[in-house]
Design a protein with these regions (language model features):
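Substrate-binding/active-site groove segments that recognize
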Residues: 92-116, 124-133, 191, 215
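Extracytoplasmic
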Residues: 60, 74-79, 84, 97-100, ...
């Protein structure tokens, strides 16, 4: 995969990766942070919880995300954003579907990427990062890299086969199917159409859309806390 994430994310934001240039020195870190929180679609409770866990829980795992980023060429803040959405950085997180840990890894995925102990945060973070990198490399959907990244995030949440089948319903030539088109299709789809189960009235298709949006929000907040300013005229996802 080389440096595809490094190139892509640098092109979408200012100083998203270690090698990117810092933002305009006339803009303070406080201004960047305030602006990013104001633009976030998260509610106040979610914002406050994120800030609390960023201060009191995340530091324990920062080096693990750095190591996973180096091993996979995926930017650290993106991995940390995925992990926050998955588990709120709780190494013992688990769901009734059997997924566990920081990146909520399944048994099948653990076997694929060599994770022996899913509740081991370092193994889980590196395993989830490897799996995400595999999904991105294998993804054939999307005319742009921005589309491909959003579609890969949806695949991490909903499963790559399900997302591929949705894309095929839109166009047999899936490489021309955009994330916007997939979102429009997912909104109309119930769980049974995806061989999944809806939770009450919350459809699995809508869950995948919300998942991508929330990872985007958390990514931008993590970048802002690192004194990194996304370009307002560009959309990350």
């Amino acid at each position: 995969m080389g440096n595809i994430f490094r190139f892509f994310l640098c092109s979408m934001t200012v100083s998203v990766l270690f090698s990117c240039a810092k933002f305009n020195q006339n803009v303070s870190c406080e201004d960047i942070l305030e602006s990013t929180y104001l633009k976030s679609s998260l509610n106040n409770f979610e914002k406050n919880k994120f800030k609390d866990l960023l201060t009191n829980r995340y530091p324990e795992f920062d080096e693990m995300f750095k190591e996973a980023a180096i091993e996979t060429n995926i930017e650290k803040n993106l991995l940390a954003a995925i992990s926050f959405q998955e588990s709120q950085w709780d190494p013992r997180a688990k769901s009734n579907m059997g997924v566990r840990g920081m990146m909520m890894v399944t048994l099948e995925t653990a076997a694929l990427v060599g994770v022996e102990k899913r509740l081991n945060p370092e193994q889980n973070i590196k395993g989830g990062a490897k799996y995400f990198a595999i999904l991105f490399k294998k993804n054939k959907i999307g005319p742009t890299e921005s589309d491909a990244l959003s579609i890969t995030l949806a695949s991490y949440n909903l499963g790559p086969t399900n997302i591929f089948n949705v894309a095929k319903k839109i166009n047999e030539d899936v490489k021309n199917v955009s994330w916007s088109q997939i979102k429009s299709k997912l909104i109309t789809m119930k769980g049974e159409e995806l061989n999944l189960t809806d939770k009450d009235s919350y459809s699995r298709g809508q869950q995948a859309i919300d998942y991508v949006d929330r990872v985007s929000d958390y990514y931008k907040l993590l970048s802002a806390h690192a004194c990194i300013a996304p370009k307002d005229q560009l959309t990350f996802f």
